[in-house]
Amino acid sequence: RRQTGSPPAGGARQPLPYEELAKLASSVVMLQVYDDQNQCYKTGSGVLINGSGYILTNFHVAAGGRYYGVLLEEETEVFYTDELIKYNQDLDLAILRMEKRRAPIPIYRGPEPLVRGQKVVAIGSPLGLFNTVSDGIISGFRTVGRRSMLQFTAPTSHGSSGGALLDLYGNLIGVITAGFDDGQNLNLAVDYQSILEFARGLL
């Protein structure tokens, strides 16, 4: 059984070893986005957020897709879905649903605030390289439009969008959404508060 999330009140908080955090990649998927001609024209990442097959990703990953291929760790089969349950372009978030079930990653709910310098782990599929795991720190807090963003240093590349940014306790603190080609390790994620607002009623 996975040990993730915040401990019970009064319990000592013990960070998970990196090896255990890396195992959470089993709840992070690679997405293939198909057009009307049944061609896969882009890829991204997504995070399972409940036990009913709901996948959280970026709107800009899901946008324009006729249907989606979902790749899971330890599965040779590709699972297909055309169920776009919900999206919000301002928050750059979307939720897909697939029939396959997997354990979700819990979303951070506090009570301690995130802090600059806090260690984080990123899991995504940059450049189509399935479920790459990297680590770094929170380097800042930004606001972009309606989005509260976490700036972090864990290396990511194109295809990581929609991937998971985790704290060291296995909680989802952000959805990776942007990187800057001209800025080394300058990456942004939509933060957990925006995720909780967007996914209310679906968790």
What are these regions (language model features)?
Residues 50, 58-63, 134, 158, ...:
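Short beta->alpha transition motifs characteristic of CBS
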Residues 167-203:
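C-terminal subregion of chymotrypsin/trypsin-like serine protease catalytic domains
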Residues 47, 156-176:
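Catalytic nucleophile loop of clan PA
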Residues 35-41, 50-124, 128-131, 146-149, ...:
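Conserved active-site neighborhood of the chymotrypsin/trypsin-like protease fold
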Residues 46-48, 82-84, 138, 165:
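Conserved hydrophobic positions within beta-strands
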Residues 133-145, 188-191:
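Short, compositionally biased
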Residues 1-48, 54-59, 67, 198-202:
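N-terminal activation segment of mature serine protease catalytic domains
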Residues 41-43, 64, 157-161:
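Short, small/polar residue-rich loop motifs at catalytic or cofactor-binding pockets
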